[in-house]
Amino acid sequence: MNILTMFSFPFMQRALIAGVLVSLCAALLGVPLVLKRYSMIGDGLSHVSFGALAIAVALGVTPLWFSIPVVILAAFLLLRVADNPRWNSDAAIAAMSASSLAIGILVISRTTGMTTDVDNYMFGSVLAMSKTDVVLSVVLCLAVLVLFILFYHKLFAVTFDESFSRATGLKVERYNTLLAILTALTIVLGMRMMGAMLISSLVIFPALTAMRLFRSFRGVVVCAAVTSVACFCLGLTISFAFSTPVGATVVAADLAVFLTSCLIGLLRRG
């Protein structure tokens, strides 16, 4: 089956549209997150999203609508912890991640059990993408992209030098909060496609790959975006061809590209 035939299926078209947009958003946000050493926040939020979706399924409400405010609140709290010198941010993120997973597992075990819907949210499924999911993903992803572009220069400033940014009158906390909220939205939107357990890889891997190939912030951002979208399309194609889980296949593609970039970096130094 060729690629054109593969994407003639409606569920693959929905997966491609939503996946490309989520991958693009995740890569753009991943660069400042990794540079600011906030990358573990993305991983923590992915576990929070699992706990939220478990509660949503148990209550019989729409998981996405329930998860968005919960994960945004968690992002706000994690950001405050990360900026507070009295707290160990890594420990706080680990505690929230473990607690969210535990809550999710307990809720599932006492209510619906491991249903197909829960499994899809945990590990991702192209078949799980409905038209409503795609429309919501498109609208919110476009909002994330527009906000990132509008505040690009300010995000650049707070990423590299918060002290100087404060001295120039920039509201650093405001833009850090914006970054956390946009990340939370992206994590929730990617849950259906990639799975809550793997969505954070879309935030981390493209940024790490780009940072080994480019030195300028703009170069890293562009490279991360291109890499993320390309790896998603490659992973989606391989997943369909070999009947493998979408999330895991996309992560494997990201990992392969990252290892290749590391090899290129070593050859450059040599």
Listing of model-derived features with the role each one plays in the protein:
Residues M1-F9, G113-M129, T237-F240:
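Membrane-interface helix termini and inter-helical loops of multi-pass transporters
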Residues M1-L24:
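Membrane-interfacial amphipathic/re-entrant helices at transmembrane-helix boundaries
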Residues F11-A18, V118-L145:
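Loop-to-helix entry region at the N-terminal start of transmembrane alpha-helices
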Residues A15-A18, P63-V71, D90-A94, V138, ...:
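Loop-to-transmembrane alpha-helix initiation sites
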Residues V31-M114, A210-V222, S239-F242, G265-L267:
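Short loop segments and helix-boundary regions at transmembrane helix junctions
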Residues V48-A58, M96-V107, A128, V172-T183, ...:
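Small-residue-rich segments of transmembrane alpha-helices in multi-pass membrane proteins
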Residues S130-P206:
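Helix-loop-helix "hairpin" substructures at the membrane interface of multi-pass membrane proteins
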Residues M193, M197-A248:
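Transmembrane alpha-helical segments in multi-pass inner-membrane proteins
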